[in-house]
């Protein structure tokens, strides 16, 4: 079975074609600058051969048509025709309260995704564009929506509700939803395997650290708490997002600076975080280099980032009544030894100690704890695309079995 995984953004379309017989990607590709000048599509095969093409990509449908051409290219493609693709899995950021798991896309699912547009205005509309484009180009191929929020639907009400008038929840669905669920689910499951324990018996704190960062407490394979909330703005400080702050800061700054609601939203989402503090960059490599040369604001930005995460690890240790492991994943979590060291230093009281040499190893599954540490520290590269492909395969196969049983 071959599954095409689609992650459609506002001006980009990431994709992977995965052969599910051995769960390996045949091709990984990206359409960039959709609807903008100088659009480009790049695709890399499993053997390393690369296709790169500059072409006009006015919308997602045209972008997907180029994906079809790339996948079936006589020289650099990986399949002879699109008939070889059995199903398509779509990343959808927000599923609201409706979806506790992935779902086969039909009219009802499409409407539910649209109903969540106001909850994820930057993400769900382009996600839906990707679905629509696929349906037009690949009619009849089963498609599955895999929701970032679904994994967090096991969080209890006392953890996901805000202490606001309850009517706001009833009217507008204002509550914590959580994000990066597909990543947290994948690494939590891998952590259980690395620990040699059944998933149901493992308690882990998963740290997805990239330009957007979130931490999740996972108990027995289920999310019980997470840092991101109603939107991905809540939680720890991030690349350009401020994370959790005193809410009274918002009207205060709006009044002092004369900002509109859209402008304050942009300030908190795109001009804050380590970028806002450092005044330099949201790239942690740049900040590391600047801090090593004595840039005090770069150092402060890194200290804030690490401190906020350290606090959450302590908090979630309490939520779980002790953790078996702390997991680091995503771009920064997998690759930055210095950030991991900043976060974990001084946590020996919680049973967390790392081996300095093992911590230097980048981008591979590894236990970087000292031999006698009570809590294991694991670095696990995330694989959201494989998780989406697995869900898509499982749901499509279940649907086929159901149809067969009904016809009998």
UniProtKB/Swiss-Prot annotation:
Gene3D superfamilies the record matches: 3.30.420.40
Active site per the UniProt annotation: 148
EC number(s) on file: 2.7.2.1
Binding positions (ATP): 14, 208-212, 283-285, 331-335
Binding site for Mg(2+): 7, 384
Broad enzyme group: transferase
Cofactor note: Mg(2+). Can also accept Mn(2+).
Record-listed substrate binding positions: 91
Tagged with keyword Chaperone: no
Predominant place of localization: cytoplasm
Record keywords: ATP-binding, Cytoplasm, Kinase, Magnesium, Metal-binding, Nucleotide-binding, Transferase
Domain of life: Archaea
Site, as annotated: Transition state stabilizer: 180, 241
Reaction(s) this enzyme catalyzes, per UniProt: acetate + ATP = acetyl phosphate + ADP
One MF term in the entry's GO annotations: magnesium ion binding
Presence of the UniProt keyword Glycosyltransferase in the record: no
Cofactors that this protein relies on: Mg(2+); Mn(2+)
Subcellular location: Cytoplasm
GO cellular component: cytoplasm
GO biological process, one term: acetyl-CoA biosynthetic process
Subunit structure: Homodimer.
Family according to the record: Belongs to the acetokinase family.
Protein function: Catalyzes the formation of acetyl phosphate from acetate and ATP. Can also catalyze the reverse reaction.
Protein name: Acetate kinase
Species this protein is from: Methanosarcina acetivorans (strain ATCC 35395 / DSM 2834 / JCM 12185 / C2A)
């Amino acid at each position: 079975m071959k599954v095409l995984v689609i992650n459609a953004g506002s001006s980009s379309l990431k994709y992977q074609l995965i052969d599910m017989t051995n769960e390996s990607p045949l091709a990984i590709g990206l359409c960039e600058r959709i609807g903008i000048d100088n659009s480009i599509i790049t695709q890399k095969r499993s053997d390393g051969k690369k296709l790169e093409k500059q072409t006009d990509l006015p919308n997602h449908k045209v972008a997907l048509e180029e994906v079809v051409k790339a996948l079936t290219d006589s020289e650099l493609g990986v399949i002879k025709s699109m008939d070889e693709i059995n199903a398509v899995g779509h990343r959808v950021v927000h599923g609201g309260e409706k979806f506790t798991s992935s779902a086969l896309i039909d009219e009802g699912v499409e409407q539910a995704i649209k109903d969540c547009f106001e909850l994820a205005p930057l993400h769900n509309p382009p996600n839906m564009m990707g679905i629509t484009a696929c349906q037009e180009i690949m009619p009849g191929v089963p498609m599955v929506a895999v929701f970032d929020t679904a994994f967090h639907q096991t969080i209890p009400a006392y953890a996901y509700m805000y202490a606001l008038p309850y009517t706001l929840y009833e009217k507008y669905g204002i509550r914590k939803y959580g994000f990066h669920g597909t990543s947290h689910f994948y690494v939590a499951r891998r952590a259980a395997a690395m620990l040699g324990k059944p998933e149901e018996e493992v308690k882990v704190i998963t740290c997805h650290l990239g330009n957007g960062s979130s931490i999740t407490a996972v108990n027995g394979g289920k999310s019980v708490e997470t840092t991101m909330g109603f939107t991905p703005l809540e939680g720890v400080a991030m690349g350009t997002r401020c994370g959790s702050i005193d809410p009274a800061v918002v009207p205060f700054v709006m009044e002092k600076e004369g900002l509109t609601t859209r402008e304050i939203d942009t300030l908190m989402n795109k001009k804050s975080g380590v970028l806002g503090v450092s005044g330099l960059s949201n790239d942690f490599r740049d900040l590391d280099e600047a801090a090593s040369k004595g840039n005090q604001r770069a150092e402060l930005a890194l200290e804030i980032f690490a401190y906020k995460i350290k606090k959450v690890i302590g908090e979630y240790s309490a939520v779980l009544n002790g953790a078996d492991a702390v997991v680091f994943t995503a771009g920064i979590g997998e690759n930055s030894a210095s950030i991991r060291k900043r976060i974990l230093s001084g946590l020996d009281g919680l049973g967390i100690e790392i081996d300095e040499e093992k911590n230097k190893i980048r981008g591979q599954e590894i236990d970087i704890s000292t031999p006698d540490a009570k809590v294991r520290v694991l670095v696990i590269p995330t694989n959201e695309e494989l998780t989406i492909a697995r869900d898509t395969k499982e749901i499509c196969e279940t649907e086929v079995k159901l149809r067969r049983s009904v016809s009998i």
